[in-house]
């Protein structure tokens, strides 16, 4: 039913957060512009200045802009929507960032790296001000900061629930008690 709200899905949410962080691209892919929709859907540009870190800080234009962003990204990453959860995969996220949103990104897989190198790469990206998109067996999310003690900030994509500062070396997902981070996507 097209009138039922479905979860946006972790892949679309994490990719949208990465794009919001960078405020890029400025122009929407033309294939996603809907001339029969709302003003935000008709817009050929992303309304980054209307989007805020917290939905309580946004007016209707900002909320519509978030909806458009999530919709565009959902289409680009081939989200499969369902009432109990929506899915995609990190390869589609990588393809979408490159082909639809003009990002230069690299895919790094932990399993093919010497011990400690994955950790070092993530820390370096964060220290240089670049958020890191993480994918693991059951969830995708964004690492978006590092503090002076070396703790990393995790945005799980659940409207702030469980977001916080974690010791990267011992970080577990709140979902399934598995060590996270088999794949990362970072800007090149």
Q: Where are each of the predicted segments found?
A:
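An acidic- and aromatic-residue-enriched active-site/binding cleft used to recognize and process polar
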Residues: 15, 24, 37, 137, ...
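Active-site-adjacent substructure of cysteine-protease-like catalytic cores
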Residues: 95-155
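Cys-His-centered catalytic/binding microenvironment captured across papain-like cysteine peptidases
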Residues: 127, 147-188
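Cysteine-nucleophile protease catalytic domains, especially the papain-like/related folds used
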Residues: 8, 12-110
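A conserved hydrophobic secondary-structure block that centers on an alpha-helix together
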Residues: 1-6
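Gly/Ser-rich catalytic serine loop of serine hydrolases
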Residues: 7-10, 137-139
């Amino acid at each position: 039913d097209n009138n039922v709200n479905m979860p946006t899905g972790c892949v679309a949410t994490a990719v949208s957060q990465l794009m919001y962080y960078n405020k890029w691209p400025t122009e929407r892919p033309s294939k996603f512009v809907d001339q029969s929709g709302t003003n935000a859907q008709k817009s050929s540009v992303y309304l980054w200045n209307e989007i805020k870190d917290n939905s309580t800080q946004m007016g209707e234009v900002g909320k519509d802009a978030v909806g458009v962003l999530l919709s565009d990204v959902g289409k680009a990453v081939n989200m499969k929507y369902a009432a109990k959860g929506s899915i995609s995969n990190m390869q589609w996220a990588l393809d979408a960032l490159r082909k639809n949103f003009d990002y230069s990104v690299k895919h790094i897989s932990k399993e093919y790296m010497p011990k400690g190198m994955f950790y070092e790469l993530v820390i370096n990206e964060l220290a240089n001000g670049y958020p890191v998109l993480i994918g693991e067996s059951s969830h995708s999310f964004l690492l978006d900061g590092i503090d002076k003690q070396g703790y990393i900030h995790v945005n799980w994509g659940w409207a702030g629930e469980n977001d916080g500062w974690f010791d990267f070396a011992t970080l577990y997902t709140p979902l399934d008690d598995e060590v996270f981070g088999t794949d990362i996507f970072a800007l090149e």
